[in-house]
């Protein structure tokens, strides 16, 4: 049965990702920045905004004579494949904790790809140059979710989780949110009959996410301080006023989001 579950997850994930991003393989796409990046892929700009994995990947590509814009369709094929693998890892990791009807399992298979195939993710993917640099982040995200939910050795679980998360948010910081949502869901399912264990693991996951996020910010601050990179003007800050402003913005947005998906859906469809 596990073999068929895995196959179903793989096939459905493949169909969803190909439906969402297959068009990016058929022909080249260009963003506002693409033409500039043909001549200068700007690795250190990626470092300035905390995407150190992207920076390293671009530097390596430059040494190998690879251009992320010119070879965008090749990398898009790899990105779609790794996205399917990542989604399978996340889905299987959560499904192992589920003791529910088969219908719920298939709903999970359909739901998890929506974190990566939606209007917000598609907006990112229209920047064709992102295909190459998102590949390691995608794989690391899937591994981070699976190791927390499936690894039994505590020290190994948390060590690998930190490593995978550092790689993942070094590719794209928003991955931290996807990680937290799916891992907290998996923890609830795995230990729903053991509140103490559930809460301790939940706080552990939130703590790891916080530490890795702070690491990302501090690394950029240190490099800027020592003149190794320029200040992007878009960097995160530890100023209390800014943090409170961001929290208020997130809370205010919830009203619009749950009412009509910020204007995308009909009123009051989201709660349903």
For each of these PLM feature ranges, what is it?
Residues 178-211:
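Perimembrane helix-loop-helix junctions
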Residues 1-18:
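Start-transfer (signal-anchor) and selected internal transmembrane alpha helices
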Residues 141-158, 192:
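Membrane-interface transmembrane helices that cradle and orient dolichyl/undecaprenyl
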Residues 47, 51, 103-149, 170-171, ...:
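Membrane-interface micro-motifs in multi-pass membrane enzymes
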Residues 6-8, 42-46, 100-110, 154-158, ...:
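Membrane-interfacial loop-to-transmembrane alpha-helix junctions, especially the N-terminal start
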């Amino acid at each position: 049965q596990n073999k068929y579950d895995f196959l179903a997850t793989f096939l459905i994930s493949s169909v969803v990702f190909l439906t969402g991003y297959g068009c990016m393989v058929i022909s080249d796409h260009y963003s506002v920045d693409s033409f500039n990046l043909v001549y200068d892929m700007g690795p250190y700009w990626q470092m300035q905004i905390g995407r150190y994995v992207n920076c390293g990947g671009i530097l390596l590509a430059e040494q190998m004579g690879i251009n992320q814009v010119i070879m965008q369709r090749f990398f898009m094929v790899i990105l779609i494949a790794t996205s399917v693998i990542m989604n399978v890892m996340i889905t299987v990791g959560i499904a192992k904790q589920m003791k529910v009807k088969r219908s719920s399992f298939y709903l999970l298979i359909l739901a998890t790809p929506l974190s990566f195939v939606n209007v917000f993710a598609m907006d990112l993917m229209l920047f064709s140059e992102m295909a190459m640099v998102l590949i390691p982040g995608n794989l690391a995200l899937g591994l981070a979710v699976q190791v927390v939910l499936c690894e039994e050795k505590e020290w190994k679980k948390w060590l690998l989780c930190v490593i995978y998360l550092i790689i993942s948010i070094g590719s794209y910081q928003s991955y931290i949110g996807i990680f937290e949502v799916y891992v907290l869901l998996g923890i609830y399912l795995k230990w729903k009959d053991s509140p103490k264990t559930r809460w301790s693991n939940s706080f552990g996951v939130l703590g790891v996410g916080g530490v890795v996020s702070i690491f990302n910010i501090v690394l950029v601050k240190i490099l800027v301080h020592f003149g190794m990179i320029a200040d992007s003007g878009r960097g995160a800050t530890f100023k209390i006023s800014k943090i409170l402003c961001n929290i208020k913005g997130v809370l205010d947005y919830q009203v619009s989001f749950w009412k009509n998906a910020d204007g995308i859906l009909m009123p009051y469809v989201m709660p349903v």
